[in-house]
């Protein structure tokens, strides 16, 4: 049976992560409070940020920026803003 968490991002009970994906106290907070679905949404935003801002994960400042964005997205309800990005419209 999958473990569930009360996801702070989705604001509902949802399937939790299988294991702690991020180190330290922040990783524990994510593991305890963020669902697998919300983590997947963050990963998509993270990829966009890394690509559009040309972040280097070997650079401490870039990793710090990304961590701040992650906390803002998952826990503070702030969306990730990427300059020039326009979401694709559905052709219904």
From Swiss-Prot:
Covalent S-S links between cysteines: none
Function as written in the Swiss-Prot or TrEMBL entry: Could be a mediator in iron transactions between iron acquisition and iron-requiring processes, such as synthesis and/or repair of Fe-S clusters in biosynthetic enzymes.
Entry keyword set: Iron
PANTHER family for this protein: FE(2+)-TRAFFICKING PROTEIN-RELATED
An annotated Gene Ontology molecular function: iron ion binding
Gene3D superfamilies: Fe(II) trafficking protein YggX
Coiled-coil features, chain-numbered ranges: none
Native source organism of the sequence: Shewanella woodyi (strain ATCC 51908 / MS32)
Annotated family: Belongs to the Fe(2+)-trafficking protein family.
Matching Pfam families: Iron_traffic (PF04362)
HAMAP family linked to this entry: Fe_traffic_YggX
GO CC aspect terms: cytosol
InterPro entries documented for this protein: Fe_traffick_prot_YggX, Fe_traffick_prot_YggX_sf
A GO BP annotation: cellular response to oxidative stress
Protein name (record): Probable Fe(2+)-trafficking protein
């Amino acid at each position: 049976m999958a473990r569930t968490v009360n996801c702070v991002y989705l604001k509902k009970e949802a399937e939790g992560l299988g294991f702690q994906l991020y180190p330290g106290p922040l990783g524990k907070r994510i593991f305890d409070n963020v669902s697998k679905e919300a983590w997947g949404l963050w990963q998509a935003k993270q990829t966009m940020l890394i690509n559009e801002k040309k972040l280097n994960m070997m650079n401490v400042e870039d990793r710090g920026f990304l961590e701040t964005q992650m906390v803002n997205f998952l826990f503070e309800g702030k969306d990730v803003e990427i300059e020039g990005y326009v979401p694709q419209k559905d052709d219904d």
